[in-house]
Amino acid sequence: MLIVISPAKTLDFQSPLATRRYTQPELLPQSAALIDLCRKLTPARISTLMGISDKLADLNAARFQAWQTPFTPDNARQAILAFKGDVYTGLAAETFSEAQFDFAQRHLRMLSGLYGVLRPLDLMQPYRLEMGIRLANPAGASLYHYWGTMLTDKLNQALAEQGDTLVINLASDEYFRAVQPARINGRVIKPVFLDEKNGQYKVISFNAKKARGMMSRCIITEALTQPEQLKAFDAGGYRFDAAASSDNEWVFKRLQQDG
């Protein structure tokens, strides 16, 4: 079973580390080439391209300039501990045991606009470069063109190393599009999390992101290996709804929360 999740814009390079072990990103040369492109962008262009404030644009221009290899524990941090958005709140990797980090390293992959695909213990330096932005590059008009089949190849490699053919897609559509799902050597199951609001069930972004992290955590901490085991997932009050699900899109619903 291979879990795929999105990165986060919110980063944490300050908190104490839950593990000292680390690995190097597998697509670092491609990341370095992207950094060379990004260093040519003015803060004003970054602001327009990413739809962010001047202050954030200045920060990310500085990050592009400061980015350097080799990555070491002194200038970089393990990806699973560096990302701190809603998904990662649900994942709570800072509480993992070493055995759980081992399981995650084999079974979890994080997609990234800059790094392509990251294993949990891969070091990364701070950045902001979302997969969906229109950054012209030698391969085409966007990062989807840039990464091409590389991300799919890496996921297929991870599946082959496991001897498995199951991908659990807990990433956003923006990021999973970069994977080219039709090229995956296996079955892709997409869990969908719906919250009741005023008598109707709908995707509430903040809640859905956190739920993706909670399901990732469940798979890792329980060392799940079979898809049917996922149907018992009940963290946060979600319950599997067989009637609303299809073969490869599994729906989990939660009753309206008080407050």
From Swiss-Prot:
It holds the Pfam family H2O2_YaaD. One of its GO terms (biological process) is response to hydroperoxide. This is UPF0246 protein SG0407. The lineage of its organism: Bacteria, Pseudomonadati, Pseudomonadota, Gammaproteobacteria, Enterobacterales. Belongs to the UPF0246 family. One of its GO terms (cellular component) is cytosol.
